[in-house]
Amino acid sequence: TVWGVVGFTVFALAPALGLPAELPGSTAAALEARQVWWFFAAGGAGVGVALMVFARNWWMPVVGIVALALPHLVGAPHPEAYVSGPLPAELAGQFAASSLVVQAIFWAVMGWTAGEVWSRMDEVAEAA
């Protein structure tokens, strides 16, 4: 389950801090710019977590923190002007929160499943 938490942090939580889930039809920046930023946010979080967890030198966690924070310091692309649509703002907040909850459940199940598979593979390898 630890790897499920890491997966959630890297692929859902870190990118959502800059680009929360958006309702369909809402005003947003260009798709390509958002995709590039998401890639760098997830990549920076992955590299950052790896450097913090598997550090062999004192400076590696520092580089990991910088890698994790850099996309957020640069900033995610946002539209120049927001145009409110027919949907209430409360719905957008509820959608973003629900999206994170569903992703957290997904990554928890994924981490548990991976742990079960790995433990059964170890049992089979020991029995052979």
Predicted segments, located by residue:
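Membrane-water interface at loop-to-transmembrane-helix junctions
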Residues: T1-V2, E32, A97
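C-terminal transmembrane helix-loop-helix hairpin of multi-pass membrane proteins
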Residues: V36-W37, F54-A128
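Membrane-proximal helix-loop-helix units in multi-pass membrane proteins
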Residues: V6-V49
